[in-house]
């Protein structure tokens, strides 16, 4: 507690620490005004949000969107929590952000939500997403805990269950990882699942406050966590790392969407903000804990990192001193270090985090791994086989009708010639000749290759009337079809989850057994 108070005072009065004394780079101070901003807003039923905000309680906020199926499936559960006496020690509210992150415009959202039946769910509307932006909320659902004094105490990305929510209210530093939850189906699934097709790399580049905040701003990064890596002791504290020579490096665990970013992309972003020739020093921070390094868990990544280092070396006369090593250990830093620059908007940082907003030149992508199929019969494999061969996201989407995040799959912006087949059975479904950029965030087509390859079903969920599209052979959930497509091409828009598909490039169609369909592409 003494150590935390020391850091709080330094953040408040601008102290320069002997260890971790960073050059000042002021970040968005909006996080400090979250309580005031909340109190000025109204709910979806036009009540003052202040009705739900008692000053003597912490506030637990759930951020959600109308286009997020997981969010919609949890509305009833969240409404029950808001009425449950177990949650009476906190203000429990939800925030929707019309006009932000592809949410409906304010009027359209109000009209849409009025058709739902959650009369006891506090839904505060923040037009433009001022609060979400100030807290770096980039995925839904996400949660934020605001203390009694108005300070941001914790941000959690993804779905949490009741036990986790209560633990968070009791202790902002609670270890939520020990309480299992499922991302897609929290009521039925028994094991954790990943938000997207995620991969993880560990980056050491000086003071982890700035590096964490920097990567949180990058589109395609799902999460960034500060911690201590590759040291000689277990479960070190900040004091251990700083004063007791444990050998750990301040490191950020970066989890990213591999369908949007490759490891090489991540490394390009990394080298933008570190001096790779500086040994045990970044900015004003000096010591072995501030050394630079890239630590991997997949041996195949060593060569990728080596190639990036070789390319980077060409920019410098001095030799690079960035470690390229396997991850030996990693321990999360104390909770007060997590999201530090959000909790302390005037805190110091040795890098310019605005560089995260600059696009990469020649951005590369990581292609999804291919899956096998029976080209002769297009039969659906057994459930055990599907769980073995599909990613968690592919399984949840095709088998449990889940939906991937909008703009999250590389197929949304893939327009190379070829065909798209059912990832489950290999059945041909759509051609690149019929694909177009609808702007909705999911791969869109004007028609299937063969009308008989898909089936249509009424879907009345979430106060909507939609037409679900499934594959014929394997009955895989694909997406929905809407009557708002290009008029000159039939007027239909097949809005399809990229996770349901496998792309076969034109030049590979013969070898893959689809040569007879090349005329559908050309």
From Swiss-Prot:
Reaction(s) catalysed by this chain's protein: L-methionyl-[protein] + [thioredoxin]-disulfide + H2O = L-methionyl-(S)-S-oxide-[protein] + [thioredoxin]-dithiol; [thioredoxin]-disulfide + L-methionine + H2O = L-methionine (S)-S-oxide + [thioredoxin]-dithiol; L-methionyl-[protein] + [thioredoxin]-disulfide + H2O = L-methionyl-(R)-S-oxide-[protein] + [thioredoxin]-dithiol
Under Gene Ontology molecular function, one entry of this record is:
peptide-methionine (R)-S-oxide reductase activity
Q: Which GO terms describe its cellular component?
A: cytoplasm
Residues in the active site?
Answer: 207, 495
- What EC designation does it have? 1.8.4.11, 1.8.4.12
Gene Ontology annotations of biological process type? cellular response to oxidative stress; protein modification process
The protein's UniProt keywords, in alphabetical order, are: Disulfide bond, Electron transport, Multifunctional enzyme, Oxidoreductase, Redox-active center, Transport
**Keyword Transport found:** yes
Q: Ribonucleoprotein: is it a keyword of this entry?
A: no
Q: Please list where the region (Peptide methionine sulfoxide reductase A) is annotated.
A: 199-354
Q: Give all cystine bridges in this chain.
A: 68-71, 440-495
Q: Where is the signal peptide?
A: none
Q: Domain MsrB spans what residues?
A: 383-506
**Residue intervals of the Thioredoxin domain:** 17-174
Recorded superkingdom: Bacteria
Q: Which family does it belong to?
A: In the N-terminal section; belongs to the thioredoxin family.
- Note from the entry: The domain MsrB is stereospecific for the R isomer of the sulfoxide of MetSO whereas the domain MsrA is stereospecific for the S isomer.
Q: What does this protein do?
A: Has an important function as a repair enzyme for proteins that have been inactivated by oxidation. Catalyzes the reversible oxidation-reduction of methionine sulfoxide in proteins to methionine.
Q: What is known of its domains?
A: Possesses 2 methionine sulfoxide reductase domains (A/MsrA and B/MsrB) and 1 N-terminal thioredoxin domain. The domain B exhibits a thioredoxin dependent methionine sulfoxide reductase activity; the Cys-495 is probably involved in the reduction of MetSO and in formation of the sulfenic acid derivative. The regeneration of Cys-495 is probably done via formation of a disulfide bond with Cys-440 followed by its reduction by thioredoxin.
Q: What is this protein called?
A: Peptide methionine sulfoxide reductase MsrA/MsrB
Its lineage opens with: Bacteria, Pseudomonadati, Pseudomonadota, Betaproteobacteria, Neisseriales
């Amino acid at each position: 507690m003494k150590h935390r108070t020391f850091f709080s005072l330094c953040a408040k009065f601008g102290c320069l620490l002997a260890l971790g004394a960073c050059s000042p780079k002021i970040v968005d101070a909006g996080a400090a005004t979250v309580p005031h901003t909340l109190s000025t807003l109204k709910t979806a039923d036009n009540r003052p949000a202040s009705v739900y905000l008692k000053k003597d309680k912490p506030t637990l906020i759930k951020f959600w969107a109308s286009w997020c199926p997981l969010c919609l499936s949890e509305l009833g559960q969240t409404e029950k929590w808001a009425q449950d006496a177990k949650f009476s020690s906190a203000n429990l509210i939800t925030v929707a952000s019309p006009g932000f992150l592809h949410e409906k415009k304010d009027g359209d959202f109000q009209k849409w939500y009025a058709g739902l039946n959650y009369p006891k769910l506090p839904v505060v509307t923040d037009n433009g997403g001022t609060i979400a932006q100030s807290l770096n909320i980039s995925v839904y659902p996400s949660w934020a805990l605001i203390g009694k004094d108005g300070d941001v105490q914790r941000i959690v990305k993804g779905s949490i269950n009741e036990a986790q929510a209560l633990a968070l209210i009791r202790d902002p530093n609670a270890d939520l990882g020990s309480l299992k939850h499922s991302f897609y189906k929290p009521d039925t699934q028994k094991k954790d699942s990943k938000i997207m097709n995620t991969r993880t790399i560990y980056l050491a580049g000086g003071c982890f406050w700035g590096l964490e905040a920097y990567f949180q701003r990058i589109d395609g990064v799902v999460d960034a966590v500060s911690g201590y890596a590759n040291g000689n002791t277990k479960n070190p504290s900040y004091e251990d790392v700083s004063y007791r020579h444990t050998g750990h490096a301040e490191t950020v665990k970066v989890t990213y969407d591999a369908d949007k970013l490759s490891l090489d992309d991540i490394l390009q972003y990394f080298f933008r903000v570190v001096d790779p020739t500086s040994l045990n020093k970044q900015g004003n921070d000096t010591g072995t804990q501030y050394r630079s390094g890239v630590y991997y868990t997949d041996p195949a990544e060593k060569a990728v990192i080596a190639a990036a280092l070789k390319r980077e070396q060409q920019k410098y006369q001095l030799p690079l001193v960035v470690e390229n090593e396997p991850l030996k250990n990693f321990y999360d830093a104390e909770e007060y270090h997590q999201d530090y620059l959000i909790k302390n908007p005037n805190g110091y940082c040795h890098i310019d985090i605005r560089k995260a907003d600059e696009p990469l030149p020649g951005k590369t992508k990581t292609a999804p791994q291919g899956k096998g199929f029976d080209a002769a019969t297009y039969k659906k494999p057994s459930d055990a086989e599907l769980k073995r061969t599909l990613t968690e996201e592919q399984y949840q989407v095709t088998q449990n009708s889940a939906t991937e995040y909008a703009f999250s799959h590389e197929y949304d912006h893939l327009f190379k010639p070829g065909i798209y087949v059912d990832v489950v059975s290999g059945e041909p479904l759509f051609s690149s000749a019929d694909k177009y950029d609808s702007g909705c965030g999911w791969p869109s087509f004007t028609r299937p290759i063969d009308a008989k390859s898909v089936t249509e079903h009424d879907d009345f969920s979430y106060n909507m009337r939609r037409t679900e599209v499934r594959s014929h052979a394997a009955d895989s959930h694909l997406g929905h079809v809407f009557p708002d497509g290009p008029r000159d091409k039939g007027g239909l828009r097949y809005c399809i989850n990229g996770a349901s598909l496998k792309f076969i490039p034109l030049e590979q169609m013969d070898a893959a057994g689809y040569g007879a369909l090349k005329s559908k592409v050309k």
